[in-house]
């Protein structure tokens, strides 16, 4: 498996996976908007996207999954933090260590940028993801509540 940072030349693969990810959350397919959204994130350096590719020659150009992280900061800790906002593995490649590899690369990014850590959220019902996060070493935050203001 090859994990690489996504650049403009990877936009088609990234958008394809991103569109499938959104469909997983019951959004309609919109590949052009997916391209626009990811292209803007890349151009403005607003996120880091990593793609997983198979090392198998027959599948070399087929994206297996992706992770997208957004930078933020902890004012109290006076350091960068990364928000692991999107993680998706194509159904044909699940249970093959793809998610673990993408999270490992995310952890490397946090270390490279001297970040305090990585935060994420997941739905209460997503027990498969919760098991993975626990296995990798993420800890549930039991000190804070998170609120959302719809505008």
Language model region names:
Residues 1-16:
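A short beta-loop-alpha structural element at the N-terminal edge
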Residues 39-51, 83:
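A short helix-loop-beta-strand connector motif used in the catalytic cores of GNAT acetyltransferases and
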Residues 51, 60-71:
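Conserved beta-strand in the GNAT
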Residues 79-91:
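Conserved acetyl-CoA binding element of GNAT-fold acetyltransferases
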Residues 89, 95-108, 131, 135:
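Conserved acetyl-CoA-binding loop-helix of GNAT-fold acetyltransferases
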Residues 100, 124-143, 149:
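Conserved active-site alpha-helix within GNAT-family acetyltransferase domains
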Residues 110-121:
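Conserved GNAT acetyl-CoA-binding A-motif
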């Amino acid at each position: 498996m090859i994990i690489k940072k996504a650049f403009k030349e990877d936009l088609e693969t990234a958008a394809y996976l991103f569109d499938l990810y959104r469909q997983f959350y019951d959004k309609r397919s919109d590949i052009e908007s997916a391209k626009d959204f990811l292209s803007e994130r890349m151009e403005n350096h607003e996120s880091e996207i990593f793609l997983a590719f198979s090392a198998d020659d027959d599948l070399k150009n087929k994206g297996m999954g992706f992770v997208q992280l957004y930078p933020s900061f902890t004012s109290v800790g006076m350091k960068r933090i990364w928000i692991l906002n999107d993680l998706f593995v194509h159904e044909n490649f699940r249970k093959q260590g793809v998610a673990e590899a993408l999270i490992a690369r995310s952890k490397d990014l946090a270390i490279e940028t001297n970040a305090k850590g990585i935060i994420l959220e997941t739905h209460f019902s997503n027990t498969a993801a919760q098991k993975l996060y626990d296995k990798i070493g993420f800890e549930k935050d039991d000190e804070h509540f998170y609120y959302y203001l719809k505008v």
